[in-house]
A protein has these predicted regions:
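Radical SAM enzyme core and accessory elements
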Residues: 85-294
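A structural motif corresponding to the C-terminal lobe/cap of the Radical SAM core domain
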Residues: 1-113
Length: 294
């Protein structure tokens, strides 16, 4: 079931903190789309008649949106506009699913993450220009390096006396880079890897996979008749030192090394993500070894 939920800001009796609570409540429902909107004061409506009573100031031209109320200031509305943009880009697009899931662990509530990211965009002037998909990833990484992790590293290091601050910071950033790479390949078979991407892990195993008929028949049955080169071009294999999804869900390094197979011929109809199959490194090694011995 496709779940699309709307939140309207600027309603009477709802202040900024109450809206934050409503956002967090709705976010926990994990809708496919979370749409933030702003109260429209249309002529002839009940809200139009009560605007003065509620202290509602609104645009006199389309889209007639609220600018402030007795409970929410103009600055509050502007901040929520920023949150709306971040939710649209980083949540509703489904292009950053695991990255956002991971980063959520460093905030008390989902709203706080989007609010902080919006403030970072404003601080750096990023909201004034259009950005491509790869640029959005670069900004998210910059956000983590310069703002987000800088706040939590001290607490994490204090909790683990055996690690110094740089080590904890580095671990968190490297985990994020791996998760971001996962999100990128989930949507697109990249022609070139981003500069921040990890080294290609298990390259020999990935190369041998496409030449192993038993493996391709098992994991890529719809590519029967294709050559190894054709399968390699239409799919992607990426090795990771961890279980990406388990790590993103827990906020900590989880699982054993694995190779993920991204099949772009089969996609999720709602998120457009490629079909992903996890193959353990031990399984790959065993299969390739048997073929070599045979």
């Amino acid at each position: 079931i496709h779940q699309h939920l709307d939140l309207i800001a600027g309603l009477p009796y709802e202040d900024y903190d109450r809206f934050r609570q409503s956002f967090n409540d709705v976010y926990q429902m994990e809708p496919e789309q979370l749409q933030l909107g702003f109260l429209k004061v249309l002529k002839g409506s009940r809200m139009y008649d009560m605007a003065e009573t509620y202290g509602i100031v609104y645009r006199r031209k389309a889209p007639y949106e609220v600018l402030k109320t007795d409970w929410m200031s103009y600055d509050d509305i502007l901040k929520l506009k920023g949150v709306e943009e971040m939710v649209e880009v980083y949540y509703n697009s489904h292009q950053f699913e695991q990255s956002v899931t991971y980063l959520m662990h460093f905030y008390k509530a989902p709203f706080d993450f989007f609010e902080d990211l919006a403030a970072f965009y404003e601080q750096c002037g990023f909201g004034k220009v259009q950005h491509g998909r790869m640029q959005r990833y670069d900004i998210l990484l910059q956000f983590a390096e310069e703002r987000h992790f800088g706040k939590v590293v001290n607490d994490m290091a204090a909790a683990d006396k055996k690690k110094d601050i740089q080590e904890v910071h580095g671990d968190a950033i490297e985990i994020l880079k791996a998760i971001m790479l996962y999100d990128l390949y989930a949507r697109e078979n990249l022609k070139s890897r981003p500069e921040w991407a990890q080294e290609i892990l298990y390259r020999p195993l990935c190369e041998d996979f496409y030449r192993n008929r038993e493996m391709t028949e098992r994991y890529l049955p719809s590519y029967a008749g294709c050559t190894a080169r054709q399968m390699k071009r239409m799919t992607h294999m990426e090795g990771f030192a961890m279980d990406i999804r388990a790590t993103a869900m827990s906020g900590q390094w989880k699982g054993e090394p694995e190779v993920l197979l991204f099949d772009y011929k089969e996609r999720n109809p709602l998120t457009y993500a490629a079909k992903m199959t996890a193959i353990s490194v031990s399984e790959c090694t065993a299969e390739m070894g048997e073929e070599a011995n045979g």
